[in-house]
């Protein structure tokens, strides 16, 4: 029997703007599982910031985190495979951040750390406070990102935001050119920086093929630039209606936005 897979981005796709799951999506995905589909979350988030959604969907598959940087097993509470950022690259990036006066949120081991409480940090921290303590991601303010980068086991990625968007775009290109790191936009005002070569599509393909399955039988849902790699790698790439036109152009199908029952409708109409 052919095993079919549904790969799901979270923010801007499966989640509403209020960071909640639509009841219709939960129900449709449960029906898809009953019909034999494997569900997997493929996100730019740290694994500590996925708990409520993973549990609500009652998943048993690993999660692809930080734009494909690592594969995390929630039940064993362990990283299965990873390509973290080399420490020397992290230190060079931190030096560049300081030179350009850009604040970064650094994703490490089991936490997200920062020096200054920027808009992105405050926004995500406020969301975290709405969760039960056992589901709350760990945010830690540190005196030095550089010192922390040398003390942890792994640096997964950096998330950067800045009031001056053109400056942030220029900085991202500068980092790619100078350090050979991967820069992907995960939100309209946020660029994620990770080890060169990491992507959602690459990690998803590796996981699917390791199970002996085919990417032709994968349906991937996404909305942003960091989703393009998996939308193109999947047999069917589905872009949300709220996606940028450049993302929609790389998908096979475009559905409604993330405030509607479009994911559920697609599942019922095309998959089960």
Curated annotation (Swiss-Prot):
Record's cofactor remark: Magnesium. Can also use other divalent metal cations as manganese, cobalt or zinc.
The protein's Enzyme Commission number: 3.1.3.74
pH dependence: Optimum pH is between 6 and 7.5.
Binding site for Mg(2+): 9, 11, 223
Entry's Gene Ontology molecular function annotations: magnesium ion binding; phosphatase activity; phosphotransferase activity, alcohol group as acceptor; pyridoxal phosphatase activity; sugar-phosphatase activity
Any one GO cellular component localisation term in the record: cytosol
Enzyme class (EC, first level): hydrolase
Cofactor(s), names only, from the UniProt record: Mg(2+); Mn(2+); Co(2+); Zn(2+)
Pfam families for the chain: Hydrolase_3 (PF08282)
Sorted UniProt keywords: Hydrolase, Magnesium, Metal-binding
Gene3D superfamilies membership: 3.30.1240.10, HAD superfamily/HAD-like
Signal peptide limits: none
Active-site residues (renumbered): 9
Single biological process term from Gene Ontology: pyridoxal phosphate catabolic process
Reaction catalysed by this enzyme: pyridoxal 5'-phosphate + H2O = pyridoxal + phosphate
Binding positions for phosphate per the UniProt entry: 10, 43-44, 200, 226
Transmembrane feature ranges: none
Family: Belongs to the HAD-like hydrolase superfamily. CbbY/CbbZ/Gph/YieH family.
Role summary: Catalyzes the dephosphorylation of pyridoxal-phosphate (PLP). Can also hydrolyze erythrose-4-phosphate (Ery4P) and fructose-1,6-bis-phosphate (Fru1,6bisP).
Protein name, entry field: Pyridoxal phosphate phosphatase YbhA
Organism (species): Escherichia coli (strain K12)
